Amino acid sequence: MKIEYKRLTEKELDNFIDKRIHQLREEGAKEEIDLVPALKDYYQRHMAEGTFVSWIALDGNTMIGTSGMSFVEKPPYFGCPSGKMGLLSSMYTDPDYRRKGIAKELLSRVIEDAKEYGCGTIQITASEMGVKLYADFGFVHNENFMQYKL
């Protein structure tokens, strides 16, 4: 098994979106709408603007792992003087390839991208399965996070 890691390009976008939908289903999300058009629009726009980056893992021509980092900016604060934040998403590894270090490698690559972008912090809403990976990397729970659904 020779795994290749590369940046996501528009050529792989449809396959990447399929993996994202599979990830959401696996995490128990309810499918109430067709997300494909919205995801495609989001990724195309933000990849073009440089505010979304992704590394993918391939076994031959088969995409077996994904990662994603969206970059956002908010007013600077003491904990993040740049105001730049990374929002980690789309971390997915095909079940047959789990526990082989693939997610760890993908995560390290998007974290490097966040550093290069100037992010002072990275946030993620972690699945149960991913908590150990993120904790091992140094992510900590933030008790202050709240959300208001519109």
Feature roles, as predicted:
Residues L107, A114-A126:
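Conserved GNAT acetyl-CoA-binding A-motif
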Residues I56, T62-F71, L87, Y92:
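Conserved beta-strand in the GNAT
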Residues Y97, G101-R109:
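Conserved acetyl-CoA pyrophosphate-binding loop and the N-cap/start of the following alpha-helix
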Residues Q44-I56, L87:
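A short helix-loop-beta-strand connector motif used in the catalytic cores of GNAT acetyltransferases and
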Residues G79-P95, N144-Q147:
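Conserved acetyl-CoA binding element of GNAT-fold acetyltransferases
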Residues E4-D18:
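A short beta-loop-alpha structural element at the N-terminal edge
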